């Protein structure tokens, strides 16, 4: 199987952490769309949003998604990539989409343990727990709609990777 694997989910679900290790275990290339975009523009996500607003960032995010999609690649996407209908269809039609699902409490704990305020501007201006709750309520249905595979991301990365590999094996054998 050489189809790209797209990891989707909210901030803190483990897309980058799991993605790097998954790519290594599958002998694939790893790309994080946010990190790729930042390296191309030499700006943080916060700086891009400040300069171009969220709409400008979302347009660049779509271009990044198209640019990094290639066979044998694990792609960690930004949490809001599913907000754009084009991106949802693109991922669904060009690879296997894996939703790393986790409850608000887990996401908040992870985000508080590794704060990245300089890299991730607030979406709502609200306290972190309220923002995560609101954003997940808004996006969960979209994540589920586009996902070929849904994985419980509350476990340790090694367990999450094992579950993804098992789900991929079942998907391929169907």
Curated annotation (Swiss-Prot):
What is one process in the GO biological process aspect for this record?
Answer: aromatic amino acid family biosynthetic process
Binding sites annotated in the UniProt record for Mg(2+): 16, 32
Q: What is its EC number?
A: 2.7.1.71
GO MF terms held by the record = ATP binding; magnesium ion binding; shikimate kinase activity
Q: Which residues bind ATP?
A: 12-17, 120
User: InterPro entries attached here?
Assistant: P-loop_NTPase, Shikimate/glucono_kinase, Shikimate_kinase/TSH1, Shikimate_kinase_2, Shikimate_kinase_CS
The cofactors required by this protein are:
Mg(2+)
Top-tier EC class: transferase
Keyword terms, alphabetized:
Amino-acid biosynthesis, Aromatic amino acid biosynthesis, ATP-binding, Cytoplasm, Kinase, Magnesium, Metal-binding, Nucleotide-binding, Transferase
Cofactor binding, note field = Binds 1 Mg(2+) ion per subunit.
Its subcellular locations are: Cytoplasm
Oligomer status and interactors: Monomer.
Question: What is the similarity comment for this entry?
Answer: Belongs to the shikimate kinase family. AroL subfamily.
Matching NCBIfam families: PRK03731.1
* Domain topic, free-text comment: The LID domain closes over the active site upon ATP binding.
Q: Which HAMAP family match?
A: Shikimate_kinase, Shikimate_kinase_2
Q: What is this protein called?
A: Shikimate kinase 2
Which organism encodes this protein? Escherichia coli O1:K1 / APEC
């Amino acid at each position: 199987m050489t189809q790209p694997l797209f990891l989707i989910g909210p901030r803190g679900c483990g897309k980058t952490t799991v993605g790097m290790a998954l790519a290594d275990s599958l002998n694939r290339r790893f790309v994080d769309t946010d990190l790729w975009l930042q390296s191309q523009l030499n700006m943080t996500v916060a700086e891009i949003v400040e300069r171009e607003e969220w709409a400008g960032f979302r347009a660049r995010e779509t271009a990044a998604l198209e640019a990094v999609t290639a066979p044998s690649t694990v792609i960690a996407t930004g949490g809001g990539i599913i907000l754009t209908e084009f991106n949802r269809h693109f991922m669904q039609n060009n690879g296997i989409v894996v939703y790393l699902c986790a409850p608000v409490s887990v996401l908040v704990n992870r985000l508080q343990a590794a704060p990245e305020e300089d890299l991730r501007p607030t979406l709502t201006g609200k306290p972190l727990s309220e923002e995560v709750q609101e954003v997940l309520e808004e996006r969960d249905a979209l994540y589920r709609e586009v996902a070929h595979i849904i994985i419980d991301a509350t476990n340790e990365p090694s367990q999450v990777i094992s579950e993804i590999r098992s789900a991929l094996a079942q998907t391929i054998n169907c």
